[in-house]
Amino acid sequence: MAAAPFLTTAGTLLTSTPAEAATIDAGQFTLATRSSNSYGEFADLTAGLAGKLTKVDATAVIADTNRTAIHLASAPNTAKAFQTGFAWDSGDQAVTYWTPQGITTSADAYGNGLYPSGGTGKALLVSWYFDDATATDKGTRLTFVDYSNASAPTYRHVLLVEPVMTSTGEYSFDPIRKHAGGIMWYGNLLYVVDTFKGLRVFDLNTLFQVATAETEVCGLHTDGSYYGYGYKYVLPQSHAYDNTGTYLRYTAIGLDRASTPDSLVVSEYSYAGVVDYSDKSFIGNGTKIETPKVVRWDLDYTDRKLRSLTSTEAVTISQQKIQGVVSRGSKHYLSVSDGETAKGTLRTFTSGSDTTTAVCDLAIGCEDLSYHSSGASGWAFSESVIWNATEYDGTRYVYAVHADGS
């Protein structure tokens, strides 16, 4: 579903297939690095928790999966150009209060596609947000999928948390109540979009094992134990990048290993081609460009953090309902959704071009994207693929399609 020419008024609807793309000043999109919250430095708070809890890394979690996914022998519903994939178990397929959104793989984390560095594992991560008006908001969970055996993937959910202090000065943590619409795994770091504010960062070398008996408690309980709503592991936030420039709706995120240096790109969702910045939670300098955008920041592979806090590329693209983005240099791939009953579409455009092109159909409810190059020597397909996750209960899939749509 593409768009009309560059929008000049907020109410313009997108009905035609051409889409207008324009390169705009990248310098207006800036971030500020943040290593603390109101309770103190993330590092100090996490160190305090480490004195109370058993610390593990992502390798240990992936080795401790407790659920079995269902291998897909063919493409899910409307998807084309299918390569591989799976469906969640019956409970996660049916649950209505947890909804999957973001996806990333060990082919993002390391160039050869294998995890850990120097290892032989193949893994995927998927983010979910909680939504139940009748219950306590449990925030965001992250699923670690062991995909080393594609015919029988296994997985485990963990809870994303922010380290805090209690009113009595004890180390604790709170749930992170965000949409988590896009995630990106780069080395030991996991980047998670914070829709109105920027990026949250998590160190996959630092998770904590917690007690599981209390499914309605998060953090330090009155019994002296720590809980994560029944999940065995919690992953604490380690850093943040807060938006300081022109407003940006951080909807999805993708890694670009084809750029020099490596970079990340962020895309914006809009219902009808006009980005909604009305929420009071948005932070920045107040400037608004309401046409959806793809914005790039360079990465430093030595420490896996941002190389610069100022964007190096920004393009507008009048495309509605963008749910995911990945880029290969100046070529950008978008997942475009169309509700609970219609197919999604993988579309592509080149920076500065005036049209998007359909690559192939995606499954109903398509969300985030992750690029998996055929050059990933350890975990390679015969051609490059793009991973996608879908959100609607009953039709939830994680699958890969050929990047060229063949």
Q: Where do the protein language model's features map onto the residues?
A:
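Sequence/structural signature of beta-propeller modules
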Residues: 2-91, 401-406
